[in-house]
Amino acid sequence: MAKVALVTGGSRGIGAAISKALKEAGYTVAANYAGNDDAARAFTEETGIKTYKWSVADYDACAAGIKQVEEELGPIAVLVNNAGITRDAMFHKMTPQQWKEVIDTNLTGLFNMTHPVWSGMRDRKYGRIVNISSINGQKGQAGQANYSAAKAGDLGFTKALAQEGARAGITVNAICPGYIGTEMVRAIDEKVLNEGIIPQIPVAAWAEPEEIARCVVFLASEDAGFITGSTHQAPNGGQFFV
């Protein structure tokens, strides 16, 4: 019987690539989303992957959504915490609401999603948790104090939880992408991309979502059973100093 993998933010961008790659690797995949219903339906029609709508910022919604997934597909063996948002602003202009929304989704969302699956993974003596952090959680980024703080928190969460899960057969790892060729990045002004961003990357190109997805598939696999508490940078050579 195929293992069940749940991917948050799993119907768009990096998450969609992860969902597709896990399905191709033989997993039964559930893709969580919180936004556009039409886009989610189109994703399901294209891939055959079931989608489930709830906000990772809401603990009760996460618990209910996870219960539904497990009732329909089986126990969750792989959890990919990918959902994330940005509310960028220089700190002197950042509002409490902008801070709270990012922390609630990008950091507290990891607790909200992982806590309901943790006991089951412990009971079954098996689990794979992959947290999608960011290179900006390691180096920081002006205009993203909220995002950088949340993504740095994801790394601390990963390392602490890995220690708790190690003897229960649960691995917990993080991936820190740099600039990835998603719709969001492609929408950046071309001059900013070509003059400000691309020159910072030694290979002079961003990564594609599928490249991050392949990292996730590896960390979810049996081959990665001895890897836990690790942070995997994927910035195409950028930020070597981190």
UniProtKB/Swiss-Prot annotation:
Binding-site residues for NADP(+), renumbered to this chain: 12-14, 82-86, 177-180
Subcellular compartments: Cytoplasm
A single BP term in Gene Ontology: poly-hydroxybutyrate biosynthetic process
Recorded metabolic or biological pathway in which this protein acts: Biopolymer metabolism; poly-(R)-3-hydroxybutanoate biosynthesis
GO MF, one example: acetoacetyl-CoA reductase activity
Keyword terms: Cytoplasm, NAD, NADP, Oxidoreductase, PHB biosynthesis
EC number: 1.1.1.36
Catalytic-site annotation from UniProt: 147 (proton acceptor)
Miscellaneous comment in the UniProt entry for this protein: NADH was preferred to NADPH as a substrate.
Protein family: Belongs to the short-chain dehydrogenases/reductases (SDR) family.
Name of protein: Acetoacetyl-CoA reductase
Provenance organism: Paracoccus denitrificans
Lineage: Bacteria, Pseudomonadati, Pseudomonadota, Alphaproteobacteria, Rhodobacterales
Gene (UniProt): phaB
